[in-house]
């Protein structure tokens, strides 16, 4: 079984940073796939002297789930790996349970990983899971291909966090044979055989020799030169370049750009993005919305900004950031304050209260983007004036304390596949230092 471990180690060595001091998180259900993964990851952790931490999520969906957590913890301890127990609490949905459980699991794992300082979570998906996804997709389920390396699917909890799947080319039966040779037992969740759900049905079909068409995800790397991030957290895409791109690539880039500019948790529906693409024929200017983003297209550029009208539908809600805390506002800006409690809200309705310096900064921002910019207000003064969070918009964004970090750039780079290994996380520089599309009218009135 050395070949299996070698295959997993090859992925770990290629994707992870051997010199990093950050811990490595591994999602550990106690099942056979995650146990095989932890066995392989333990070898890498020993080789690189990095700390490995197992994360176990108790979904609370089966009566013995607490006992399963105990067993998982005991197995991890036997392998010398500390385990953190996480629980999905609260009411559970009456429909769409697998999807809700998956979202809760990723959210809990992302939050725990961030608190540990981990930047990568190892996931035990196998080739069988990939083949099951193909069957599920063929049956109409909205599932995509599993990738060896991908950003966390939850936002903003998963910002800066990546998933690595070292077992994706390996078969489940081979991994279980390896575990048996090692004298290790694993948990079998009866839900995996519950034919009321799509995945167990796909698993049964796969065992009977049925195969689905492979799921092909668009490769966005050829489009890397088409997009830029504006200094206020929007996105600009080269219109003509997008027109020349393959349709599936163009649609996916539109979906991602809209999510990053709007701060939305998920992607707009492909049909809506294809509708936007249909309007790109020729060079006629237009304005349209997609997934919470306002898209303005002129001859040269498509610009994506937060749709300010979302305020009327409950978006852009204010938040309070306590001293020493970091929070995300509107899915777009990470706010950190060291000394004073802050209220963070949208600029809309507060522009008249800005000081001269902040107003000068605001006038360098596209008029349509201004209402959705973040402003601070300290809570220790009853009549504190609002302060623009983005304190400078020259060649790049300059920050003061409290700090405000736009998340659009890193998120888009991750989703577009530009971050391919741990050492690259947070290092992709795509800020538009010289980009000043014609829609920016410096000195325009508010």
Features from the language model and the residues they span:
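Short, low-complexity, polar/charged sequence segments that are solvent-exposed and flexible
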Residues: 73-76, 103-105, 141-143, 183-185, ...
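Secondary-structure junction/capping motif
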Residues: 2, 95-97, 201, 401-411
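AMP-forming adenylation/ATP pyrophosphatase catalytic core
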Residues: 9, 13-24, 29-30, 53, ...
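ATP-dependent adenylation/nucleotidyltransferase module used to activate substrates
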Residues: 1-143, 173, 380
């Amino acid at each position: 079984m050395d070949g299996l471990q070698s295959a997993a180690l090859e992925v770990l060595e290629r994707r992870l940073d051997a010199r990093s001091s950050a811990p490595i998180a591994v999602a550990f259900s106690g099942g056979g796939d995650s146990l095989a993964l932890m066995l392989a990851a333990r070898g890498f952790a020993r080789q690189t002297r990095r700390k490995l931490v197992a994360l176990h999520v108790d979904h609370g969906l089966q009566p013995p789930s607490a006992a399963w957590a105990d067993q998982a913890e005991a197995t991890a301890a036997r392998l010398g790996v500390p385990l953190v127990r996480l629980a999905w609490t609260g009411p559970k949905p009456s429909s769409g349970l697998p999807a809700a459980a998956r979202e809760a699991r990723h959210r809990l794992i992302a939050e725990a990983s961030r608190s540990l300082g981990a930047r990568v979570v190892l996931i035990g998906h196998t080739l069988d899971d990939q083949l099951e996804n193909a069957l599920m997709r063929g049956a109409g389920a909205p599932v995509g291909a599993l990738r060896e390396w991908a950003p966390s699917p939850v936002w903003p909890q998963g910002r800066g966090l990546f998933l690595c799947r070292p077992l994706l080319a390996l078969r489940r039966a081979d991994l279980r044979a390896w575990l048996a040779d090692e004298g290790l037992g694993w948990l079998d969740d009866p839900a995996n055989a519950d034919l009321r759900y799509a995945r167990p049905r796909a698993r049964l079909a796969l065992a009977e020799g049925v195969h689905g068409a492979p799921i092909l995800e668009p490769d966005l790397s050829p489009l890397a030169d088409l997009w830029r991030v504006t200094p206020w957290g929007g996105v600009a895409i080269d219109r003509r370049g997008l027109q020349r791109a393959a349709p599936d690539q163009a649609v996916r880039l539109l979906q991602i750009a809209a999510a990053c500019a709007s701060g939305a948790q998920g992607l707009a529906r492909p049909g809506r993005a294809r509708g936007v693409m249909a309007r790109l024929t020729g060079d006629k200017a237009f304005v349209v919305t997609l997934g919470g983003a306002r898209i303005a297209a002129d001859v040269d550029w498509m610009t994506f900004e937060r749709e300010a009208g979302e305020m009327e539908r409950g978006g852009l809600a204010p938040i309070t950031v306590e001293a020493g805390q970091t929070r995300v506002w509107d899915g777009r800006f990470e706010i950190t304050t060291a000394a004073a409690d802050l209220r963070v809200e949208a600029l809309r309705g507060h522009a008249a209260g800005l000081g001269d310096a902040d107003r000068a900064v605001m006038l360098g921002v596209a008029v349509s983007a201004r209402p959705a910019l973040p402003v601070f207000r300290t809570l220790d003064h009853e009549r504190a004036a609002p302060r623009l969070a983005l304190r400078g918009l020259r060649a790049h964004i300059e920050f003061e304390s409290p700090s405000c970090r736009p998340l659009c750039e890193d998120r888009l780079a991750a989703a577009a596949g530009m971050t391919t290994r741990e050492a690259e996380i947070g290092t992709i520089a795509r800020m538009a230092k010289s980009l000043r599309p014609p829609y920016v009218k410096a000195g325009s009135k508010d």
